Amino acid sequence: MQTLKKFIKYYKPYKTVFFIDLLCATIISAIDLAFPQLLRTLTKTLFAGAPGKIISALIPITIGLLVAYIIQTACRYYVTYAGHMMGARMERDMRKELFDQYEKLSFSYYDQNNSGQMMSKLVSDLFDISELAHHGPENLFISLIKIIGSFIFLFMINRMLAVPMLILVVLMLVFSYGQNKKMQETFMDNRRKIGDINSSLQDTLAGIRVVQSFANERIEQEKFNRSNENFLISKDANYRCMGSFMSGNAFFQGMMYLVTLVFGGFLIAHGRMEASDLAMYALYIGIFISPIQILVELTEMMQKGLSGFRRFLEVVETEPDIVDAADAKPLKNVKGSVCYEDVSFHYSDDDTPVLSHVSFEIPAGKSIALVGPSGSGKTTICSLLPRFYDVTEGRVAIDGNDVRKLTLESLRSQIGLVSQDVYLFGGSIKDNIAYGKPDATMDEIVDAAKKANIHDFIMELPDKYDTFVGERGTRLSGGQKQRISIARVFLKNPPVLILDEATSALDNESERFIQKSLEELAKDRTTITIAHRLSTIRNADEILVVADCGIAERGTHEELLALDGIYARYYDMSR
């Protein structure tokens, strides 16, 4: 019931269309219900009279019915067009809400959830929700009107024959309720299994170069086939439930005709019913059964739609871990001093400490470098500054302001990030550079490209800055992609910079180009650099050696070599 209440609120912006839609549905149903009763009345009164009287009455009857069917046709058009558009607009609204929520959710959510499942919720689930949004209330309303209306007429025609019909309807409702619960479980399982297929497909397509380079196509096919077979098994269980549901309802519908024929014949034989009334009874049984068949189909649609809506709610009702505090203020006039005060951190789903009582300061415009083994917490330290995660204990401050007391937008707009995992969007080189400042002029984009040492390469391309980079920048080399990402940060022009192993995946020649760009980028900015190649950080104002959840050593390059500890050992190994 709570799910239905939440679903109904999405009708609110379209309540006028919704109520007109229901009014049109009422008119359609009323005309369908009125015709057999009109025919019964005419058969017993007018058509039993003189031929001349019958012929003279046909003209007004024809005009009246023609007007009624024209009105019904107009109502059907409105229900079909406006009703579907209402569902499509609700789907649009939900898709926007879901996408906006994906944009708000914290890194911890993406650490624990699969993007294939998220895509399934954004596309497949919302399509089923849209179908339910339009057809659900309309079909339910029409069906109820026809069922109730036809039953009233059945009682009016012959009460004795209506009693066994009522008993059959009650038995059918009890049967349908039991089958519905089973179908709901199988539809939810279907959703999960199709999400698994999407996940498997996305993994394979995103990593197709790795798959083919290792000649592991067969392994990926086997993984996909397992997901595909699991979906088939889930569908099998679903269709078994549907088969029982639909065949059971068809049996009860057949019983209604059987009872009408046998019990009606018995009543006619005993003079308690006229043969013409039995014919009308059969017509109303047809009108009664038709909406039942619609409700049977609606049950499948409702289970799909509500299952999708529950999955939709799972996302939109998830509270992001990282949000603006109630008293958050914008970060202004940034100088760039950074301070980590007794910082400890562990992930929300794991109590194992990643950082323990880490403290250091970076004066504005100065640079520090973080070195240490993989998994020691270097990237985690950097992730706490723009609040990709929040500290468990202690605080991180910029210009003396606790980052948790600042608005996320103002904080992150002052921090530039260049990482080894470069992500370029499917578009042009110009679009990707301009991502750092969406309203940038062409001159600003070119200037940023020149500073990143990528302008000359771009000008050699046939389409220059309008060159399409391919999905994730597949048409460019690693070094070219990295320089575009650096140009993006030049354009953003932040006072604080994070360089997360920005050259670790590059060859020596590309690294020299990139290193020159990075040095230009870091000039007069507060910079945190993570590097495995120690030659790239020798000139840092301070180097921190991160190990065992904390800072094991700190000092300049020369001081750490003189200390002859962990850093000195790393340096010797790198030579």
Model-derived regions: residue spans:
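An intracellular "coupling" helix at the cytosolic face of ABC transporter transmembrane type-1 domains
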Residues: F107-S108, S124-A133, P137, F141, ...
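Juxtamembrane loop-to-helix connectors within ABC transporter transmembrane domains
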Residues: Q2, Y11, V79, G83-G87, ...
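Transmembrane helices of ABC transporter permease
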Residues: P13, V17-I27, L65-A68, E138-D189, ...
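Cytosolic ends of transmembrane helices, especially the final helix of ABC transmembrane type-1 domains
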Residues: K193, N216, R240, F288-V315
